[in-house]
């Protein structure tokens, strides 16, 4: 309910003058957090959502125990969604126009950044950094990417007359109708660290459980390149402070939703703001703005 909800509501990423925008304190966003708090007080939100881990979440999706889901995208979601759909052909989770901006902003869903899906580091304690680098280089190559996505030609996929990759009938049948076994035996296209979307263009195969969701998202993606990788450098005092602030914000969000009334909501929010100020917040924002300026230079803006 952090950046994903903010993107859904179209919360800006920068001020009119190009400086960093404090999305967590956006009035439109906080109005929706208040709405969720009201829903919690009325018994419409279960306490389970605050404690379910990844495994519990997947199990509940597979059995349709969530009345609704709020997710930022479909990566790593297709498996449990497909299990539910296969077992219940007349029931499926679909994307809908849910929370909307109260000030007229259109959804601005995030997409892959200039630096790729994620930034990876090789630890200074790595026993063989050269081998680690070779592994990364292999996996980000076209050959490695296609291997992660489709497996081995002739065993898990074939190439049709149009040059498109197709999973073999046996593999596709397992993926669609016995996804747990598919993940155990093949686990294709689920190596999230190297889940490059460009390899989707090699195939017309789709996972039925996510087709409608992906179609719903068409036209809603907006680049956020200018705020990419703007956090303080690792091991710096500001990085440690930001880590503490982010952890505090995660617990604050839970407390905001579970607050007993508006007064308690305001008090919890004020405590978080005070926590930020006591942890060099101004210094962190200064770094945000400096790195945003550097990003603009890279983008030629």
Report each predicted region and the residues it spans.
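Extracytoplasmic/secretory soluble proteins
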Residues: 1-301
């Amino acid at each position: 309910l952090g950046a994903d909800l903010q993107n859904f509501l179209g919360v800006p990423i920068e001020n009119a003058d190009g400086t960093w925008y404090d999305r967590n304190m956006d009035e439109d966003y906080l109005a929706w957090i208040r709405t969720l708090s009201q829903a919690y007080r009325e018994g419409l939100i279960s306490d389970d959502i605050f404690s379910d881990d990844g495994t519990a979440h997947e199990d509940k999706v597979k059995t349709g125990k969530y009345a609704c889901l709020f997710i930022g995208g479909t990566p790593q979601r297709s498996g449990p969604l497909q299990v539910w759909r296969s077992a219940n052909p007349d029931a499926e989770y679909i994307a809908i126009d849910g929370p909307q901006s109260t000030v007229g902003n259109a959804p601005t869903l995030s997409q892959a950044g200039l630096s790729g899906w994620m930034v990876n580091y090789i630890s200074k304690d790595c026993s063989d950094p050269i081998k680690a680098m070779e592994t990364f280089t292999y996996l980000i190559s076209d050959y490695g990417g296609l291997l992660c996505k489709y497996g081995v030609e002739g065993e898990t996929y074939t190439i049709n007359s149009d040059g498109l990759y197709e999973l073999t009938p046996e593999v596709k049948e397992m993926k669609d109708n016995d996804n747990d076994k598919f993940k155990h035996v093949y686990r294709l296209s689920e190596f999230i660290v190297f889940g490059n979307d460009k390899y989707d263009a090699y195939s017309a195969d789709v996972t039925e459980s996510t087709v409608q969701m992906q179609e719903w998202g068409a036209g809603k993606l907006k680049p956020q390149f200018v705020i990419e990788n703007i956090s303080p450098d690792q091991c710096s005092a500001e990085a440690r402070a930001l880590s503490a602030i982010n952890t505090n914000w995660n617990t604050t969000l839970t407390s905001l939703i579970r607050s007993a009334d508006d007064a308690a909501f305001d008090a919890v929010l004020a405590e978080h703001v005070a926590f930020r100020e006591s942890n060099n917040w101004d210094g962190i924002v200064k770094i945000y703005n400096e790195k945003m300026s550097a990003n603009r230079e890279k983008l030629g803006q």
